[in-house]
């Protein structure tokens, strides 16, 4: 199956919504209001089938800080799983992160083996170290304090804040150093 990986457009949001719905019904992805998808469409890339133009996968790269971003909402249509579409899409997100100058990529996932193939490692509970950083992602205390001001749930999940733990669905937090 041949697909083209490209930036998402507003006309793709309905297809992205459908992909998310499939995964959120199964408790794999958190549901997002459609308005949030439109607001963040510039963060998304999609995989489009070359033979019929159908969007069969999506993924987003959300920048959290100067050197930190999150891979979000990576979803592949069931009919396309096992064909490397998700891997190609993730590689495009990582390429985008490199281009932006982001050095660390975070994800919250059930798909630990998939992300591990790309170099992601599981991270544990955040703890402050003697040098003023927060393990395991090594965030300086001043940056941590700034990130606490964010209203973004993904930032709260990365920081492992108590208020979002019920929403993380038992996912693993993973980190990649580029």
Describe each model-derived feature in a short phrase:
Residues 1-31, 48-49, 54, 150, ...:
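Short amphipathic alpha-helix that is part of the acyltransferase structural core
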Residues 12, 67, 110-111:
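A generic "binding-loop/recognition-motif" signal
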Residues 82-95, 107:
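Conserved acetyl-CoA-binding loop-helix of GNAT-fold acetyltransferases
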Residues 98-99, 106, 110-178:
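Terminal substrate-recognition subdomain of acyl/acetyltransferases
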